[in-house]
């Protein structure tokens, strides 16, 4: 009787692992899908992407009988470096047996896919978004939101000429800051929002002033001075590019009677303006 072995299963095992891990990673991506993705521009190689910043133009009034004046702006640029190489690796013994156990297979695939997604999301949140300082709002108390403070953050976007009602503006909050928002009656009272959308019933905030709201542990809630407890940002505020989408590679190691599986990704992300620029559509809420 024919037997399915590591040799005969070799053709389908890598593909199945790849599909399962990448599918789970994609489901876990959230921030990546809410920023400006320029991956197609680095698909052919290169470790840096120079993105022109076109200077805002001001229309002039033409006087009768006068010639038009031509502008000669000096446009800047934003440099996006593809310099983050992250990975997750496991050595799994008796791979075919794991493969045949759907529960165990699912646990491994989810674990590896989640690790990659979490690493990329954490970089965008902590190293990019939370590095912005130009539109900071200082909270009155650690991890404590008020409607006035949120409106103050929105005003900073408006002062920079940005709309927050275009469906491309998001509010992320630490668990403690999110919990504080849940306690604001302006966003939770049934008399204000109606019972169908009332977080006191659903447990979900949904949106605040038209912005989707998400709780994330990538925002700190330990009460440290200056820590970012929440962030409002627009899609245009962050540039992201992945030169190597999460890939899965495997190799059987006869010395260990196990299969080594590695998932890795090569990417970069940066703010669309200088971190201290008030024109940057990113607002951080900082602990006092």
Residue ranges and their predicted role:
Residues 70-106:
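Long, hydrophobic/aromatic-enriched structural stretches that serve as scaffold segments
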Residues 94-164, 279-288:
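Alpha-helical scaffold segments that mediate packing/assembly in large oligomeric complexes
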Residues 56-59, 64-76:
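Active-site-surrounding "flap" and adjacent substrate/cofactor-binding loops of secreted or lumenal enzymes
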Residues 46, 87, 166-168:
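Short coil/turn connectors at secondary-structure junctions
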Residues 2-6, 11-35, 42-45, 52-58, ...:
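Sequence/fold signature of self-assembling virion shell proteins
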Residues 132-205:
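Extended, solvent-exposed, turn-rich assembly/linker loops in the middle of proteins
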